[in-house]
Amino acid sequence: MREHARSPDLVGRVLNALHIAARMLASIDEARPSRGDDPGIRGFQATYRDKIVAESAMLVLCAKGAAHHDRRISECVDAVIGPINRFARSEQVVSALCVDPGRALEHAVAHIILGRLGYPDAKLDQLLSLCHASGAGVGPERLPHRQLEQQWLARLWGGAHRPDHGERSILVQSMLGRTLDAFGSSRLDVYAFTHALMYATDFGDRRPRLPRKLSAIVLDAETALAFALDTDDLDLVAEVLLTWPMLGLPWSPTAVFAFRRLTAVADERGFLPGYNFVAAEYDKLTGDEQRQYALVTSYHANYVMGFLCALALRRGGTLTDSVSADRRYRGAAAALIDLVDDAAETLAWRRQFDALTPDEQDRVSPLLLAIVLRRAKNGGDMRVVQHALAVAVKHDLCGSPSAVQAAALLRRGQFLVGYFADRATERGSAVNVAVE
């Protein structure tokens, strides 16, 4: 998976993702039944094959918009269009549309994207129209971000004239309509956040009326980055970083730091390790087996890296943040890093952090605050929560979701202490009465 991974520029990383897509699509032809859904096991389930084809089409959709930056992007896009077309319009897809009309748009993701890119298939469009109409009243219950996906696919398929019924209500119910839980959110919560934004914005090509201010959504994205970086979930880091180019916003210091982390790992390994990647398993393998393991466990992370770099190119390609740290932040990073426990030296992101200048470290102090507070809360260490909030007050970092929610946590903790103290007093009084 090395092809272009060592290229320092965004174009090289887009090319790398497209080369990986070509290899993944070629692997489908060699698919054999696997032992379950684990993508680390050789072979692909039918649903996994559909996922690869759909995500490959999404990668092409993003990369096509950046093709004017380098002719090699167009060449790589053209190389994968053919295999995508073959799978997107196969007999299996036709059968799935007819048998499962309630999920017609999901079955036709790659077909719809190809049509949008100028590769139509009128006959399959006719069948899709029939099946989609038949399935309108059936199909699965969908979470808000999946409802937004349906609207995104409808827009791609039908163009700008197709209305988005109830979009505002769906956005309000989605993760874009509420503050992310800085301490209790899971990977799936962050996934719902990133995908709601992908679909609502058409991967950055559309500006919907969002239910909250952009600044609030960006704060949530930075909170999500703290979680993803601290768990070393680089696939998720890349997804969250899509927030900035999709909203057309300059990259924040936290976002730039996270991107540096991704590129450092990708350049060291030759690919970006995915969520299912286990270094110990990878290191046991050699040759083709090792390359296949890296490909199948990490293709998605590298696709998302391709999305990210393509969208960044479309927005001008500037990732470097040159703004000096606010004077109020000076010294915040040193104070916060001291609050991380003895495992600090083994933190996955620590090497990138230590490579920063003191001024750069202070610029990412909101990220450090979020990491420290989440670790302290989940470890039950309210003393560290208090100390971290004291640093936040001193350096004017109190506006982040992590700080606000940590302060609320301490207030609830004080109530709990008083509640149990009162209960203990009541029990003591009851014992005295019984003795008397």
Segments predicted by a language model, with ranges:
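Compact integral membrane and secretory-pathway proteins
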Residues: 40, 81, 105-107, 111, ...
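Terminal, non-catalytic domain-edge segments
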Residues: 1-66, 130, 135, 174, ...
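Eukaryote-skewed repeat-based solenoidal scaffolds used as protein-protein interaction platforms
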Residues: 85-235, 247, 256-263
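Extracellular glycan-recognition/adhesion modules and their associated mucin-like linkers
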Residues: 45-49, 237-241, 245
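An N-terminal, globular interaction/scaffold subdomain
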Residues: 29-116
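Core register positions within helices of long alpha-helical scaffolds
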Residues: 59, 110-113, 153, 199, ...
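Amphipathic alpha-helical protein-interaction segments enriched in hydrophobic
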Residues: 231-242, 296-304
